[in-house]
From Swiss-Prot:
It comes from the Bacteria. This is tRNA dimethylallyltransferase. It catalyses: adenosine(37) in tRNA + dimethylallyl diphosphate = N(6)-dimethylallyladenosine(37) in tRNA + diphosphate. Monomer. It comes from Ruegeria pomeroyi (strain ATCC 700808 / DSM 15171 / DSS-3). Its EC number is 2.5.1.75. ATP binds at G20, P21, T22, A23, S24, G25, K26, S27.
């Protein structure tokens, strides 16, 4: 990635956090830092935990994984539930290892949980989630404690549904659980936090080219191999590109249409990521990329 000149000082052993939008070059930067300063690369991307997705999730290649240790990549079966809470429980023991953790990904909530703490909320029972999946957004909002609802983005169904599920399953409002948040496993002050500040047009061009690169690396074959087990409700099948290629494999759309839909979905996701990073990562070191 060749951004070494822009890096801040990286003290011996200090954990490094790397956040950035999809297709911005985070994995390349993590590998560069691991090779220059030492460390183990730890995944903080929700789609890259599944063993069935390498090309479609842009998981590091076997050749890249051979250049430095990688953890929490492709270690779960397709039907495993996964959330920020699952990730936090997996990553916390790794902070006490002998190797410097280089934690890299685009899932902003993971970094917030790591550096600010996260309430230990019980897992949502499947029947409660199934009920929530059937309810329209306004019904979900109506069933949430007003104090919790006041702090939510009411247009973000995933956040609204999560708040509804917690209250329905536990009988306790989400904001009360959050008030009991324990200390963070890794306070930001103990880390070297880096966020990639990307030029929008540069990123859009990379996104446009990325889908074809995924196809060249076998993304269509990956999705075809999972077609018989496809369940759009499972987190693994919500990875961008999977629903679009499934629709193509079912004969519903052309490959060109799948490419266009996936590119649009990726741009929309990148826009949400960039907004999150600007709003929530003001104390992180900015690394300009592209442009």
């Amino acid at each position: 990635m060749a951004v070494g000149a822009a890096l801040p000082p990286i003290p011996e052993g200090a954990p490094v956090l790397i956040a950035g939008p999809t297709a911005s070059g985070k994995s390349a930067l993590a590998l560069e830092i691991a090779e220059r300063f030492g460390g183990v690369i730890v995944n903080a991307d929700a789609s890259q935990v599944y063993d069935c997705w390498r090309a479609i999730s842009a998981r590091p290649s076997p050749e890249e994984e051979a250049r430095a240790p990688h953890l929490l990549y492709g270690h779960l079966p397709y039907d495993a539930p996964y959330s920020a809470g699952h990730w936090l429980r997996e990553v916390t023991p790794l902070l006490d290892g002998t190797a410097r953790p280089i934690i890299v990904g685009g899932t902003g909530l993971y970094f917030t949980a790591l550096t600010e703490g996260m309430a230990d909320i019980p897992a949502t029972p499947p029947d409660v989630r199934a009920e929530a999946d059937t309810l329209p957004l306004d019904r979900l909002l109506a069933g949430i404690d007003p104090a919790t609802a006041a702090g939510l983005d009411r247009n973000n169904r995933a956040r609204v549904q999560r708040a509804w599920e917690v209250e329905r399953a536990t009988g306790r409002a989400l904001h009360l659980w959050q008030a009991d948040t324990p200390p963070p496993p890794l306070p930001l002050a103990r880390t070297v936090p880096l966020v990639l500040e990307v030029d929008k047009l540069w990123l859009w061009d990379r996104i446009a080219r990325r889908f074809d690169q995924m196809l060249d690396q076998g993304a269509l074959d990956e999705v075809a191999a999972m077609a018989a087990r496809y369940d759009p409700a499972l987190p693994a099948f919500k990875a961008i590109g999977v629903p679009e290629l499934m629709a193509h494999l079912r004969g519903e759309i052309t490959l060109d249409a799948a490419r266009e839909r996936a590119s649009i979905a990726t741009r929309q996701y990148a826009k949400r990521q960039r907004s999150w990073f600007r709003a929530r990562m003001g104390d992180w070191h900015r690394l300009p990329v592209g442009g």
